[in-house]
Amino acid sequence: MAVSRATLFDKVWDLHTVGTLASGQTQLFIGLHLIHEVTSPQAFAMLRERGLGVLYAERTVATVDHIVPTQSQQRPFADTLAEQMIRALEDNCAEFGIRFYNIGSGSQGIVHVIAPEQGFTQPGMTIACGDSHTATHGAFGAIAFGIGTSQVRDVLATQTLALDKLKVRRIEMNGSLHPGVFAKDVILHIIRKLGVKAGVGYAYEFAGTTFEAMNMEERMTVCNMAIEGGARCGYINPDAVTYAYLKGRDFAPQGADWERAVAWWENLRSDPDAQYDDTIHFDAAEIAPTVTWGITPGQGIAVDEIVPRPEELPGEDRPLAEEAYRYMDLAPGVPIVGTKVDVCFIGSCTNGRLSDLREAANLARGRHVAPGVKAFVVPGSERVKRQAEAEGLHEVFLEAGFEWREPGCSMCLAMNPDRLEGRQLSASSSNRNFKGRQGSASGRTLLMSPAMVVAAAVSGAVADVRALLEPTP
């Protein structure tokens, strides 16, 4: 265990250090490896080329999520490449003895949804996955990295990664959030203020009373988008909220093992006098419902603000802003409220969990999607879908004019049939608004909370969700 004055990151890093490589990098043991159908086929092929096997199949969990259709999931898929990729994962998992949650298993879903909900993700773990948003698992006090295909191969073969140790930045936020402000607004606000490159070389520790008051699914939303602020990973110290979420889940410790685990997890928390490379403070009361207007997650504004004028921006931000004005067809100085939307999407590893769907359904109840708007809800997993239907949430969405889909990554990245067409503009609860991200080379994306997506869907345009919270006269 690291000495006192250590952060959780330091403690977990030290506990998982195998050695120091000639390059100066740390060889880090990976406790849990999550794989899916897109970044694993080439990794398995590289194993076979070298005559290698999977070192710890029991520490590997697989599912299909990126390319699966969310309307009909009847096999074989119409998309032959998608069918081939899923068959490859089926075959690879069978050959190497890897636990695999396929469509129809009852537990399939987005990889960053299924691992926490089943209790695979636990405090103090090191976790890797061939997906950018692996930082999601940091919500549990784990250190989780998104990795590339060659690194997927390395973890399969050696259960280790070669990594440079990160600096640690404490993002401290205190205070209560106003009604209509959600975890998604919090992380969009942080990225807006710090920028998309500020976290390069850092792990972000999210701390303070605001994060302590969040439930686990809200914390996952925050950590999920740490990468969008440039951070390699983000995490929150485990606490009673963490333990209450984990207790009794399929792969969480049971009985006496549970008590020992909680005692161990408590020791992993950052020490009260931990030394950080720097600390940045935020006031939760300053955050309003937030929406992106541009082509990076850092180009965000409060919903009641105007699209920023170039002269109001730092000089280094102006070229990208000019590019965003042209691509998004938004004029500087104009309110973002009232911007017409074509598609409204609720889902993704950022906001496709049960609490997200409950909040969205509460706002959709008694309202209806505006004419000309396509709106759909994609549960993050088969378990989320099953529970949402048990609560009747799907009926609320259907009555309000939303489509109710099968689990998958869906329009977050459009490696599946869920895509924008032409210059369509989407209100999306996902995590990236890059050019072409949602399937059309000219499609446009506004990132926002699921509640804000509902407000846009029923209004037919960007709208302030706080108006939906006001009592009807």
Curated annotation (Swiss-Prot):
It comes from the Bacteria. It catalyses: (2R,3S)-3-isopropylmalate = (2S)-2-isopropylmalate. GO terms for molecular function: 3-isopropylmalate dehydratase activity; 4 iron, 4 sulfur cluster binding; metal ion binding. Binds 1 [4Fe-4S] cluster per subunit. Pathway: Amino-acid biosynthesis; L-leucine biosynthesis; L-leucine from 3-methyl-2-oxobutanoate: step 2/4. Its EC number is 4.2.1.33. Its cofactor is [4Fe-4S] cluster. InterPro entries: 3-IsopropMal_deHydase_lsu, Acnase/IPM_dHydase_lsu_aba_1/3, Acoase/IPM_deHydtase_lsu_aba, Aconitase_4Fe-4S_BS, Aconitase_4Fe-4S_dom, IPM_dehydratase_rel_enz, IPMI_cat. Keywords: 4Fe-4S, Amino-acid biosynthesis, Branched-chain amino acid biosynthesis, Iron, Iron-sulfur, Leucine biosynthesis, Lyase, Metal-binding. [4Fe-4S] cluster binds at residues 349, 409, 412. GO terms for biological process: L-leucine biosynthetic process. HAMAP family: LeuC_type1. Catalyzes the isomerization between 2-isopropylmalate and 3-isopropylmalate, via the formation of 2-isopropylmaleate. Belongs to the aconitase/IPM isomerase family. LeuC type 1 subfamily. Heterodimer of LeuC and LeuD. This is 3-isopropylmalate dehydratase large subunit. The lineage of its organism: Bacteria, Bacillati, Cyanobacteriota, Cyanophyceae, Gloeobacterales. The gene is leuC.
